[in-house]
Amino acid sequence: MQIFIRTKKALYTTGVGERIIAHAKKVVEEERLVKDYIQTNEGEIEGKISIGVSSLIGYTILPDILAKYLNDFPSVNVKIDVGSTKDIIANQGDYHLSIVRGSRILNKENELLYSDKHYLVTPKDVDFEDLAVIEFQADPDYITHIKNYFEERFNTKYEPQIFVDQITTCRELLRKKVGITVLPELVLEGLDLDNYHIEEVMAGDKPLTRDTYISYDKSVLMLPQVESFINLIKQDSLSNEQ
């Protein structure tokens, strides 16, 4: 394959040679553009981050965290999956980090973010006996604590009449005075508490609490966009403790 043809008087480029030269110029130009971009954006955090979040956190805490994160790092593309903790753990390999409640993820770094208490919430202007008990989907141990509290507190069998798969649905049913339910402290925000009886739920002689963890592999800390998100949500956690 000839790229050049040399004669006694000149050097000529063949058709193949012209294509090779054009390609080489294009590569050199693209390399220059990349170098210029790197110099211009040196120190800027960008890239992609994928996050799996339990539904309760996705509904309550995440929107404010995400708004601040994107304000600080507008060049980052964020992908969020919201679902039950069980689903998030099952699909943990799809995410740079996961935020789950109640359970740590095996073989991951697990840092405690929040530990919230729980309260029995009852509308004030409706007779207790006329209200259905609403139960949201949760792990068996957690439901057992609620059952034991209810039966000890009211000396009656715990018999939920309404079962929902999202705790936020419990809150909305409560707003409509459909029934009574137990809600985490996080979900009480936004309710007009003057309209409800609020009673702390106990597990034996201690308050019933639910822990929220952020879980990730140490290796993802090498990605600035991921490390920045983790630092931001940890700062929020610390501010809530104060």
What does each model-identified segment do?
Residues G52, H118-T144:
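Short loop->beta-strand "edge-of-pocket" segments that line small-molecule binding or catalytic clefts
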